[in-house]
């Protein structure tokens, strides 16, 4: 293609799945470019070795598979959870938060290998194309970015399958013997889209769920756990200090075994259309509940309410791909400042898809049983003071009412 005629070497974000395997071959045959593959170990597990073998089979000499799990949780997931970020009220941004990290490594590898461009397998209809490219341009304004879904002649996954067969590219099959759902997975979540899920009126088949058992089949006995926090980040489970990635993985196990973290969502994509996805975020769902609980006793009301007002904008920035933007960093600075005293321990009961907070304690707690007690507070609070407080706050309301009565 003439627009890429000067590109000699490309770093491809490679999962080993259908789209990126075909993109790899397409870059070789249509552009004549040397391809370097980068696969991020974000906690997706068995996807990694097949990706290496496919890349080797397709003649790739430079294959980068990097374990970025600790970096992912420490530098991306945990900062996001300090904000209690959810998009459109429910989505914990599991796919969104991984994209800037992948772009960061693509840019680093391009510099290391002398590549002219980077490439990704995001479609021209989705959010990921925006997330990958905004992040990449923020880190290297001169980088060339190839997005084959916007350039090639393929219009459907059926055509991709035909191309794969023509070039003897192996494609994974799901339990139905068909091409698999469009799947994204990392240590925070998994998502499934496409096929029967494109009809939002139909319940997702049980076999779509990869990370959790059904709440109906979860144990009849509740699981009790304690999560410890320091400066807004989870640092321990049941008193055992763990690294960020290890801690999230352990929460995933608790969530999986108790049917926690399933979400069937129709969301508003950045490009303007609505899409339906099935998400599983077992550990993240537990972590969010615990973090909000420890904040409830350690954050001042004004700070907590302002933080809640900022959260939708912060979540939207991540969803839209503006992780490396100045406005996200400004919000992060404010959020991180609010977390200085967010420490302590939260006790949770996990039962059949539910996360219930049953206890919270902190050396920095603002909760005072002497103030709120229904018993004798020994003069800690004079209830007569409330009368003046109420009169002052009622002044404008009484003035309005008097005017309207005329």
From Swiss-Prot:
The keyword Mitochondrion does not apply. Keywords: Amino-acid biosynthesis, Arginine biosynthesis, ATP-binding, Cytoplasm, Ligase, Nucleotide-binding. The keyword Acetylation does not apply. GO terms for molecular function: argininosuccinate synthase activity; ATP binding. L-aspartate binds at residues 123, 127-128. Pfam families: Arginosuc_syn_C (PF20979), Arginosuc_synth (PF00764). L-citrulline binds at residues 91, 96, 127, 131, 182, 191, 267, 279. It comes from the Bacteria. It is found in: Cytoplasm. Coiled coil: none annotated. It is an enzyme of class 6 (ligase). Its EC number is 6.3.4.5. GO terms for biological process: argininosuccinate metabolic process; L-arginine biosynthetic process; urea cycle. PROSITE patterns: ARGININOSUCCIN_SYN_1, ARGININOSUCCIN_SYN_2. ATP binds at residues 13-21, 40, 121. It catalyses: L-citrulline + L-aspartate + ATP = 2-(N(omega)-L-arginino)succinate + AMP + diphosphate + H(+). Its main location: cytoplasm. Homotetramer. HAMAP family: Arg_succ_synth_type1. Belongs to the argininosuccinate synthase family. Type 1 subfamily. This is Argininosuccinate synthase. It comes from Brucella canis (strain ATCC 23365 / NCTC 10854 / RM-666).
């Amino acid at each position: 293609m003439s627009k890429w005629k000067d590109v000699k070497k490309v770093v491809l974000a490679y999962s080993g799945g259908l789209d990126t395997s075909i993109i790899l071959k397409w870059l070789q045959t249509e552009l004549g470019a040397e391809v370097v593959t980068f696969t991020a170990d974000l906690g997706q597990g068995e996807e990694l070795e097949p990706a290496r073998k496919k890349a080797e089979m397709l003649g790739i000499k430079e294959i980068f598979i990097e374990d970025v799990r600790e970096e992912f949780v420490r530098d991306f997931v945990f900062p996001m959870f300090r904000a209690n970020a959810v998009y459109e009220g429910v989505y914990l941004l599991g796919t969104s938060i991984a994209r800037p990290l992948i772009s960061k490594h693509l840019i680093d590898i391009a510099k290391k290998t002398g590549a002219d461009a980077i490439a990704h397998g995001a479609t021209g209809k989705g959010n990921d194309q925006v997330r990958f490219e905004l992040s990449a341009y923020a880190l290297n304004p001169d980088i060339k970015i190839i997005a084959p879904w916007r350039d090639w002649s393929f219009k459907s996954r059926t055509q991709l399958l035909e191309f794969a067969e023509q070039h003897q590219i192996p494609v994974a099959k799901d339990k139905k013997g068909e091409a698999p759902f469009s799947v994204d997975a990392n240590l925070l979540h998994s998502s499934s889209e496409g096929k029967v899920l494109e009809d939002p009126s139909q319940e997702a088949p049980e076999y779509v769920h990869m990370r959790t058992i059904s709440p109906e089949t979860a144990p009849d006995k509740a699981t009790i756990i304690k999560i410890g926090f320091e400066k807004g980040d989870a640092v321990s489970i049941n008193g055992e200090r763990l690294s960020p990635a290890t801690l999230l993985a352990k929460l995933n196990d608790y969530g999986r075994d108790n049917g926690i973290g399933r979400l069937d969502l129709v969301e508003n994509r950045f490009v303007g259309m609505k899409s339906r996805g099935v998400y599983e975020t077992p550990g993240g769902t537990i972590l969010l509940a615990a973090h909000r609980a420890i904040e409830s006793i350690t954050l001042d009301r004004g700070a907590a309410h302002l933080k809640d007002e900022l959260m939708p904008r912060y979540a939207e920035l991540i969803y839209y791909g503006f992780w490396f933007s100045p406005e996200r960093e400004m919000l992060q600075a404010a959020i991180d400042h609010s977390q200085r005293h967010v420490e302590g321990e939260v006790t949770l009961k996990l039962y059949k898809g539910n996360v219930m907070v049953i206890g919270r304690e902190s050396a920095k707690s603002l909760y005072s049983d002497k103030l709120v007690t229904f018993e004798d507070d020994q003069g800690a609070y004079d209830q007569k003071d409330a009368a003046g407080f109420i009169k002052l706050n009622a002044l404008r309301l009484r003035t309005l009412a008097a005017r309207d009565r005329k």
